């Protein structure tokens, strides 16, 4: 089955469904056990930060890019490379609800201005127009082999002839997690096997949920699905609810394929297959065996939000449209905006390159995989490969 990526920036053109702030719920920041550290070799392909340059960059965000060593966390590959080149990251913590206001206040006051800030959909063009960021062309050469394969994407973030976003990587936006023990107990087909055979589609997903819910004991309420899945289901058609030809927008809501997807979602809702509550994370969603699928980003199913030793949880992509051979995945783009007022040019350049190298070099990607599996010992290699397949 062919897999095509759809950047998360295009989600607005596909659906009006929204999701609560990712990462805001769960206990992934606590109870972390010491994990085995993975050795990461240095690279000669990235220059060290000059001795006379500012070597520390300030990161403003809702999470720390540095590991919490008191909790036994390992460094990311990119942080290891950055430290080896003389760089350090200073963390300024902000809440999800206040991050944009605090960034704007820092820029306006020119006090404690962060050097980098996570790319999100508001960054371009809205926040660029507010003069919150500076172009990256002075520190990123998109003709360089390290950056060449993201140039097309970077060209979508040009204003006034300048690039404002340097894409680091693309990661699957959502996956469906389920409990294999529940699947086996109900005598249902294994979704992962269906996925491997190219048969994981709307039809068997719907049938599976219907059977699971209808077989509930008299005193038990069951649901087929919870989380953020509506947008992704529509995207499996390969169509958008609004078309843009480079000059004008046109309404595409009456496209027959869009209508098929919407009818499917209507049936899923009408037949009470959806638990519409905010359950927070996979651990909460799957704990009692009365929900078949939990659909959310990997943040909600890893770390302390993920499976425990006794769990047999698995993951699959959002089921595909049975009327097409293509598989479309919403892809979240990782990038760091260079904040207006930052003077750490050389250090930010180095950070960008370390991040990009960590996500493109095969050895470093293998290091990253090992770190992930060490931190998530109840994720199997097959589960990790689903992430890779849907992110590539």
Place the predicted regions along the sequence by residue:
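Conserved N-terminal structural module of periplasmic/extracytoplasmic solute-binding proteins
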Residues: 8-9, 13, 22-125, 343, ...
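Glycine-centered hinge/linker elements that transmit conformational signals in sensory
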Residues: 207-210, 244-278
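Hinge/lid segment of periplasmic solute-binding proteins
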Residues: 32-55, 97, 119-173, 203, ...
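Long, aromatic- and glycine/proline-rich binding clefts that accommodate carbohydrate-like moieties
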Residues: 350, 363-392
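Short helices/loops that flank or line small-molecule/ion binding pockets
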Residues: 100-113, 130, 183, 206-211, ...
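Extracytoplasmic/periplasmic solute-binding protein
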Residues: 58-60, 117, 158-170, 174, ...
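Bacterial N-terminal signal peptides that target proteins for export
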Residues: 1-7
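Extracytoplasmic/periplasmic substrate-recognition and gating elements
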Residues: 306-371
């Amino acid at each position: 089955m062919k897999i095509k990526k759809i950047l998360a920036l295009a989600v607005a053109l596909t659906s009006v469904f929204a999701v609560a702030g990712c990462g805001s719920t769960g206990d992934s920041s606590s109870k972390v056990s010491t994990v085995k550290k993975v050795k990461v070799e240095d690279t000669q392909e990235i220059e060290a930060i000059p001795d006379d340059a500012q070597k520390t960059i300030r990161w403003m965000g809702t999470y720390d890019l540095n590991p919490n060593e008191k909790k036994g966390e390992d460094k990311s590959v990119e942080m290891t490379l950055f430290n080896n080149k003389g760089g350090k990251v200073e963390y300024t913590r902000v809440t999800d609800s206040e991050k944009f206001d605090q960034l704007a206040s820092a820029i306006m006051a020119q006090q404690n201005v962060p050097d980098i800030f996570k790319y999100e959909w508001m960054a371009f063009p809205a926040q660029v127009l507010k003069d919150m960021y500076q172009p990256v062309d002075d520190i990123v050469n998109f003709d360089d082999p390290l950056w060449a394969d993201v140039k097309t994407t970077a060209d979508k973030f040009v204003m006034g002839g300048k690039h404002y976003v340097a894409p680091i990587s693309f990661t699957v936006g959502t996956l469906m997690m389920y409990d294999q023990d529940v699947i086996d107990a109900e005598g249902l087909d294994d979704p992962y096997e269906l996925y491997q055979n190219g048969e994981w589609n709307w039809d068997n997903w719907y049938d599976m949920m219907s059977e699971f819910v209808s077989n509930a004991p008299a005193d038990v309420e069951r649901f087929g699905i919870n989380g953020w899945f509506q947008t992704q289901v529509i995207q499996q058609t390969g169509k958008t609810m609004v078309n843009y030809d480079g000059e004008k927008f046109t309404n595409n809501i009456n496209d027959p394929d869009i209508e098929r997807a919407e009818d499917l979602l209507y049936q899923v809702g009408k037949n009470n297959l959806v638990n519409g509550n905010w359950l927070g994370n996979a651990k909460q969603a799957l704990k009692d065996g009365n929900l078949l699928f939990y659909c959310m980003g990997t943040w909600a199913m890893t770390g302390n939000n993920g499976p425990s030793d006794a769990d047999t949880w698995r993951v699959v992509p959002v089921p595909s449209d049975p009327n097409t051979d293509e598989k479309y995945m919403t892809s979240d783009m990782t990038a760091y905006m260079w904040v207006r007022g930052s003077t750490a040019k050389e250090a930010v350049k180095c950070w960008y390159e370390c991040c990009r190298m960590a996500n493109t070099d095969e050895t470093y990607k293998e290091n990253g995989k090992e770190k992930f599996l060490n931190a998530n010992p109840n994720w199997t290699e097959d589960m990790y490969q689903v992430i890779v397949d849907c992110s590539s």
